[in-house]
């Protein structure tokens, strides 16, 4: 459970449903929270834009209205992805960008033309955005597609497990939105 990886944001109450949220639930956006889907993203009152400038993002993400048991319902929700950025930072001893550079971007040859790291936005507290804000060129994005086609292998390195690629490219939960969710 994510509660074991970032316990400061979770309750000690064993009955609290949030303590059942796993990394898989967060990765698949099935962690159980309600996210208003009736807003148009360009609307300045969209919850994403209101949430974007908040310093207490993790607390806000976890203290929203509950919708379904974790793992049972897909809701496109960038807060679950952002929470993963916090998990990476707090458990790897490096920022999400440094971790991605070491384990993914640099092995894939993904850098700026001057050789520096890619551009990735940070939230008000310094965590890298987990759900958006990463700037890549089409050629750099194509490398991810090729990595998936090669089942996680890049040249002579296995960057992500073939089991993960298999799981990530198959349906995880039935969704009501055609073309969204895996």
Language-model-derived ranges and their functions:
Residues 43-63:
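Amphipathic alpha-helical interface segments
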């Amino acid at each position: 459970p994510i509660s074991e990886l970032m316990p400061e944001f979770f309750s000690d109450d064993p009955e609290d449903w949030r303590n059942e949220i796993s990394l898989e639930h967060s990765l698949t956006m099935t962690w159980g929270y309600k996210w208003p889907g009736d807003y148009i993203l360009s609307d300045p009152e969209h919850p994403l834009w209101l949430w974007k400038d908040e310093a207490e993002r993790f607390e806000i993400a976890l203290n929203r209205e509950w919708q379904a048991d974790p793992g049972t319902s897909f809701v496109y929700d960038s807060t679950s992805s952002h929470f993963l950025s916090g998990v990476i930072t707090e458990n790897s001893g490096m920022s999400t960008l440094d971790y991605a550079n070491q384990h993914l971007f640099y092995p894939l040859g993904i850098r700026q033309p001057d050789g520096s790291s890619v551009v990735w936005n940070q939230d008000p507290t310094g965590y890298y955005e987990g759900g958006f804000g990463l700037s890549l060129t089409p050629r750099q994005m194509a490398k991810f597609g090729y990595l998936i086609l090669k089942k996680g292998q890049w040249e002579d390195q296995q960057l992500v497990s073939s089991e993960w690629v298999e799981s990530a490219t198959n349906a995880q939960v039935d969704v009501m939105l055609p073309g969204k969710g895996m």
